[in-house]
Amino acid sequence: MSGHPGLTTHVLDTARGKPAAGVRVQLCRVTGDTRTPVTEAVTNSDGRTDAPLIERGSLKQGTYELTFHVADYFKGFVAAADPPFLDVVTLRFTVGDTSGHYHVPLVMTPWSYSTYRGS
């Protein structure tokens, strides 16, 4: 995995069968009750951020939160509820092996979501 970045994400809209462009993503490091902002990005036309959220050499062990602001994305579609059912989706996960690549995608519809550790 020597060429892989440390932490990346990808947002897929399975209701429309497309990558979700324009979703604001925030990354925080969590220590106890404290959330420290690391970076913020917006997904591109492929549903990915233009750069890794954390480069491989900068990834540290610990707990992180990815927060996806999905309500604004779903407001643009007639099929979505008004107001949208999902507003913000937060995924909390732990990094143990900093030599690996952590790809944490969000797979969503206007009414549900899922995630997994991808490659």
Curated annotation (Swiss-Prot):
Keyword annotations of the record: Hydrolase, Purine metabolism
Pathway assignment reads: Purine metabolism; urate degradation; (S)-allantoin from urate: step 2/3
SUPFAM superfamilies noted in UniProt:
Transthyretin (synonym: prealbumin)
PROSITE patterns per UniProt: TRANSTHYRETIN_1, TRANSTHYRETIN_2
Q: What is its EC number?
A: 3.5.2.17
Q: Which reaction does it catalyse?
A: 5-hydroxyisourate + H2O = 5-hydroxy-2-oxo-4-ureido-2,5-dihydro-1H-imidazole-5-carboxylate + H(+)
Q: What GO biological process terms are annotated to this protein in UniProt?
A: purine nucleobase metabolic process; urate catabolic process
The UniProt GO MF terms for this protein read: hydroxyisourate hydrolase activity
Binding residues for substrate, per the UniProt record? 10, 48, 116
- What highest taxon heads this organism's lineage? Bacteria
Task of the protein? Catalyzes the hydrolysis of 5-hydroxyisourate (HIU) to 2-oxo-4-hydroxy-4-carboxy-5-ureidoimidazoline (OHCU).
Q: How does it assemble?
A: Homotetramer.
- Family under the similarity heading: Belongs to the transthyretin family. 5-hydroxyisourate hydrolase subfamily.
PANTHER family reported for this sequence: 5-HYDROXYISOURATE HYDROLASE, URICASE AND TRANSTHYRETIN-RELATED
Any other comment in the entry?
Answer: HIU hydrolysis also occurs spontaneously, but more slowly.
The record's listing under NCBIfam families reads: hdxy_isourate
Protein name (database record)? 5-hydroxyisourate hydrolase
Organism of this sequence? Deinococcus radiodurans (strain ATCC 13939 / DSM 20539 / JCM 16871 / CCUG 27074 / LMG 4051 / NBRC 15346 / NCIMB 9279 / VKM B-1422 / R1)
